[in-house]
Amino acid sequence: MFNTVWKDFKNGKFEPNYLIVGEENFFIDETIRILRTSFTEDQVELITFDLEEQPLDYVLDEADTIPFFSEKKIIIAKNASFLKATEKGKEKIEHDFKRFEAWLKNPSDTTVTIFVAPYEKVDERKKVTKQLKENSVVLQAETPQNKI
C-alpha cells in the first residue's frame, strides 16, 4: 500500500486525508518526505501539529485557511493519541470530535492532511476512529515480517 501511495504522490495524485497507523518510523518518515518532495519549495507549506499537545481545532483551522504563498498545504498531525484506547478523562487535550467528523466529510481541497498514530493499534470501537478511517487513505506502518 505504501508503494502505491508513494507512486501517486510522485505522479501528483493526492487525497485530502491520510491516516498512518503503526510503530515503524521508516514508513511514516518516508511518506512525509516523498509527499514533501512531490512539490517545489514555493508550491507548498508544511505545517506540523502534535495532537498530544494541541487540540484538533488547530489542525482544522489551519486546514480550512487558504494557503497564502503556495498552492497547497501539507499538515502533519502527529501523535493522534485520541485514536487509541484510553480511560475517559485521561487525554491531556480536549478535542472537538463533532467538528472533526463534520470536517472529514468536507475537507479542504488545498490541503493534504496526514494523521499519524504511531501506535501498534487504534481503538476500532471509537466513533472518531471509524470516521477517520472511512474518510482517509489508511496506511499500516508495520515492521515487515520475514516469511520463509
What do these predicted regions represent?
Residues 1-148:
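Conserved beta/loop motifs at nucleotide-recognition and modification sites
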